[in-house]
């Protein structure tokens, strides 16, 4: 088995030596050998391998000048180290460098050479081989370029723990140490580059891009990382395509069609130059311009793409370049290259031919004749000349390298070349650490050190992982746990050189991976030249920017970057472009007309200064003034009959409550505060209840006095002044209790209402409890209803007491106002709620004031003749006569029915005649006037002791039984004469009938003396007279003052019933008669 392994190793080495001839490698002996993998060519020639004969090795095509420069950088670094006394003294580094042709197959051929040589060296087969010279093991490999190539190489080298230090492979997949154990690199991870690309797109506010990636281990992971970063930044990708340098024409055209039809103007490309070149050629052929290319580092400075004939397509490209380094002496080293001097560099011959477009004869020592063409195979060589060199002129060998412009001499921005230089020095410093290792301080078991003369690849890998040194630029070089060397990026922009028309790469910014997020990117926009030589940033968005005041609205079925601009709703705003959502204004603010900002809402309430508030205030003040004026009039004329008849004390209290009603309306005007909200409803409710309570007590007392059948001492006791005030207090106290409960359980408070109107804040009072408010108004209306009932019943009282009629009107007004108030209150909002209540308060208050008091004030001020005791007595007597007359007219029908039942004759139909004459012309004789003036009012005791006096009649009519009642005033006499055509035998029936009739008359007598109970009338068969002394006529609500004494010379009106069952009025003048007739 051992011999079988030896044979495999020998076969691999033999095969590899035949595959790579002398012209296909750069090699130099040394104590320690470093391997190198560089893309000297961009690809290989496609051949149809039909396997009819032995397959031949593919031929590399399309020379890569930058690849040759990178190779030169490795050779320069090795020679510089060999000449340095400080680094690896007494040791020489050698190299074996192969061309990968930018393909995996060629790279693996070279890698097999490294692995096979190491295997042979480890087997120590020199004693079995007839070898002319010993080739040491390759302890480290520098390369490769593309991530796909490096991935394949790393898988193979990792099996033998041969360290691989790449200078250009940036795929993030290579950071996986579980798979790529021996891989390290001097270029940053693509993860940072993808993040930087997304940051650039976000910086220019682009959100609609396309992506193109090479279909390899470099393009796919890179573009996948970009997608992740783009999604975090709300960047949408319109299309995503994969390309390769081996893609056929149809595939390339399909990708170009997608690019041409897309609305995305920015295209992100993760690819190498060779993979992208076929696509760019087709785009140039179709002349598709106006695109912004965002280039990854692999092609950002590619000479295949950065060609002047492509500039109208790729001009303005933004790319990422590695940080340029300084390599002292490298420029001179590049200029010294010559095929006859570079004996260890087998690639120099082809470089010379490609640079000067000539053919260099093999083995030539001097210049060859110009214009000599070679059409056959050269001696000593088996290589078939390709079409690019077959008909070239021979090279003289004296060509000047500085006379031509090639990427090889672009040494101003050394990026990849510096990475190669740094990779070589990293390996050298690892070897230096081994060389200077002291026993006990080593990295191996028990602190042991490796032997530099017998060093193995895995030992170098161990030291590379712990490497830490300072390079020639003063930077610290160390590999992280993933084998990556963190670095920064330069941002370059493709310009057209005005000097020679070539494409130059202008540095317009940088990306610092060490900085904080948001501070990593710096771009100088003034230096950027966009496609078409424009200085304006191109637009690459699916939708136009949404200006301030709008937001982005999602379009169904489209990516999130494709949106429509939706205006912010009222109450919301957006102060920036492309806002994803509108911000809601604070509660006290509202959006302006353009929805770009918030402005303070208008605050509205029933203000003192607005016209409506001024009008209501003036009406309230007018009401207060009128009420105060009426109160003043009543106080000034407090001793007049009209004022006395209205119960002065309750009238004063009623006017005071009206003052409070008018004043309470002012609490509803002005900005509501907590204290005004808690005061206004109770003030309104208590004031109105006090007012209505006064009216209720007055009205009810008048009704009870005038309709009481027997006004006994019980009535006089309980309807005194104190009881009246007590009833007013009790009615008002109930309202006070309601208000206290309301304020304790749910007190009203000021409230800023934002919901009624969007742009206005209504400052109103929150009532706390609608039930409490309803109870307050309901109790007020209940008292008003009771008051209305009694007032309606009292509407026909004497004229001087007919304020009940006006109270009825005022209550009607009150109900109309408050019934209208309820729907108006419920249907209004804002300040109009307060206005409606103020109007209701004022209307009800004016109604009460006008109906109850204006008529009296008018009489007091403008009709003083009606403000006399005679007027009051006449009105009272008229009411009494009307009641008595009604009772008298009803009685004959009753008597007739009773006579019929007893078998008596039917009485004649009563007739009546009414006449009005002076006292001297009375048809019926008047009783003699009393010689002594009687007191107008008697004490309670005197009223109880004084009997009714019977006086003889002045005229006798014996043929008719006659019962006569005579009522004597201090100023005259009123005589009631009642007669019936009844037989003598029915005297007892007559007596009973007269007693019943006297009860009807007592209703009238009650109006004459309400403080004195009337005894039943005493009637005999003969006429009789009853005289009652006048106690003075007073208003129905007054009980604490003495009436004035009138002169006895004036005769008061009298009602006299004749023998023919008619009645006449005696005395009082025609006006009284007319009033009675009217009644």
From Swiss-Prot:
Q: What subcellular compartments does it reside in?
A: Cell membrane
User: Which annotated residues bind L-tryptophan?
Assistant: 147, 168, 170, 297
GO MF terms, alphabetically ordered: amino acid binding; calcium ion binding; G protein-coupled receptor activity; integrin binding; protein homodimerization activity; protein kinase binding; transmembrane transporter binding
- Cysteine-rich (CR): where is this region? 542-612
Tissue-level expression: Epidermis, kidney and cartilage.
Please list where the region (Ligand-binding 1 (LB1)) is annotated: 22-188
Keywords attached to this Swiss-Prot or TrEMBL record, sorted alphabetically, are: Calcium, Cell membrane, Disulfide bond, G-protein coupled receptor, Glycoprotein, Membrane, Metal-binding, Phosphoprotein, Receptor, Signal, Transducer, Transmembrane, Transmembrane helix, Ubl conjugation
Extracellular compartment spans: 20-610, 669-674, 746-769, 829-832
Sites of the modification Phosphothreonine? Answer: 888
- Which residues fall in a compositionally biased region of kind Low complexity? 900-918, 932-961
Q: Which Pfam families match?
A: 7tm_3, ANF_receptor, NCD3G
Q: What is known of its domains?
A: The extracellular regions of the homodimer interact in a side-by-side fashion while facing opposite directions. Each extracellular region consists of three domains, LB1 (ligand-binding 1), LB2 and CR (cysteine-rich). The two lobe-shaped domains LB1 and LB2 form a venus flytrap module. In the inactive configuration, the venus flytrap modules of both protomers are in the open conformation associated with the resting state (open-open) and the interdomain cleft is empty. In addition, each protomer contains three anions, which reinforce the inactive conformation, and one calcium ion. G-protein recognition is mediated by the intracellular loop 2 (ICL2) and the C-terminus, which contribute differentially towards the binding of the 2 G-protein subtypes G(q)/G(11) and G(i)/G(o), resulting in distinct CASR-G-protein interfaces. The C-terminus confers selectivity for G(q)/G(11), while it contributes less to G(i)/G(o)-coupling. The C-terminus adopts opposing orientations for G(q)/G(11) and G(i)/G(o)-coupling.
Q: What does this protein do?
A: G-protein-coupled receptor that senses changes in the extracellular concentration of calcium ions and plays a key role in maintaining calcium homeostasis. Senses fluctuations in the circulating calcium concentration: activated by elevated circulating calcium, leading to decreased parathyroid hormone (PTH) secretion in parathyroid glands. In kidneys, acts as a key regulator of renal tubular calcium resorption. Ligand binding causes a conformation change that triggers signaling via guanine nucleotide-binding proteins (G-proteins) and modulates the activity of downstream effectors.
Instruction: Spell out the subunit comment.
Output: Homodimer; disulfide-linked. Interacts with VCP. Interacts with ARRB1.
- This one is known as Extracellular calcium-sensing receptor
Underlying gene: Casr
